[in-house]
Amino acid sequence: MKITIAAVGKLKEKYLKEAVSEYSKRLSRFTEIEIIEVDDEYAPDSLSVAQESQVKKKEAERLLKRVKQGSYVVLLDLAGEQTTSSGFSAKLENVMLSGNSHITFIIGGSLGLDQSLIKVADYRLCLSKMTYPHQLARVILMEQIYRAFKIIKNETYHK
């Protein structure tokens, strides 16, 4: 089993890099984990709708180039399904049991998602209706993936 997290933008803060490193280490017991960072597109504060759309399209193209053919694609999306940690672990287990050997989680840029990403998604996941910095969403996602594996393996985990 391999999990890839493809995200727009690079982690800048040391504490976030340390958290990603820690969860990568923890996850290595259960799965191969790969983190892919693609460049975010420059976007001034005031953009027209067309310019905003162009930024999202360019970021989506960068992400889509990194998705391996045959990978089960999970898109983090505010319009996606909200679930519990137990529900997420059940979903992850079902994906693995149905023969998928590679899952790619996609975290879009700060302006949102291009339609091309929505079209390729096998599943759209909403971590929360609250807004988080994309870098923090990466850490939250990794923690939930780790928690899901602990649930699947019936191992205890601090609640």
UniProtKB/Swiss-Prot annotation:
One Pfam family hit: SPOUT_MTase
Subcellular localization: Cytoplasm
Top-level taxon of origin: Bacteria
MF-aspect GO terms: rRNA (pseudouridine-N3-)-methyltransferase activity
Annotated family: Belongs to the RNA methyltransferase RlmH family.
Role description: Specifically methylates the pseudouridine at position 1915 (m3Psi1915) in 23S rRNA.
Official protein name in the record: Ribosomal RNA large subunit methyltransferase H
Organism: Ruminiclostridium cellulolyticum (strain ATCC 35319 / DSM 5812 / JCM 6584 / H10) (Clostridium cellulolyticum)
